[in-house]
Amino acid sequence: MWTQRNAVGNWLLVLTAVIGFITFIWIPQTSAECQTRSIYCYECDSWTDARCKDPFNYTALPRDQPPLMTCNGCCVKMVRHQRSPYEVVRRMCTSQLQINLFMVDHVCMMESSGNGHMCFCEEDMCNSSKNLHTNGCQLHLIPIAVAVSWLMGQLLSR
């Protein structure tokens, strides 16, 4: 039986689903706009420059640190042969890679063997960090995704 209470419930369900959908569209676009600004990234390879190794001495005087370069993308830190005598650390800008990524701030990818990783970040000199971790700015999307999925399921099952 169709009642006014059901109509209000359906209306709220649709409104919540629409707001959730708009949130998923709007948030990535605002994040992508921030990536167009220039940032500074360290540019070095520990194979040829010991200053590039971990742990990185970010408290050293600028002249004692690896060179900085202006970057119109994201900073990258790549590690090969992690935690071994052959460990190699490379810090650079994504403009030097043949890669097209969106919203990669504080994202790390592990090598399949587990002996290396590659991390991306979007703040000045952020590739000096020994460990880049997710900063939690995108974690609020998980409950929204669950709620929107549940609401869409409820809406489609009626």
UniProtKB/Swiss-Prot annotation:
Post-translation: what modifications? Answer: N-glycosylated probably on Asn-57.
Annotated region (Loop 1) at 54-67
InterPro entries (UniProt xref): QVR-like, Sleep_regulator
Propeptide feature ranges: 128-158
Please give the start and end residues of each transmembrane region: 136-156
| Signal sequence, start to end | 1-32
Per its UniProt entry, which superkingdom is the organism in?
Answer: Eukaryota
Q: Name one GO biological process term.
A: regulation of synaptic transmission, cholinergic
Q: Which positions are glycosylated?
A: 57
| Lipid-carrying residues in chain (GPI-anchor amidated asparagine) | 127
Query: Where in the cell?
Result: Cell membrane; Membrane raft
Reproduce the free-text note on domains from the UniProt record.
Answer: Consists of a single Ly-6 domain, adopting a three finger fold stabilized by 5 disulfide bonds. The first loop contains a region essential for protein folding or that is required for localization to the cell surface. The second loop mediates protein-protein interactions.
Protein name, entry field: UPAR/Ly6 domain-containing protein qvr
The species this protein was found in: Drosophila sechellia
Its lineage reads:
Eukaryota, Metazoa, Ecdysozoa, Arthropoda, Hexapoda
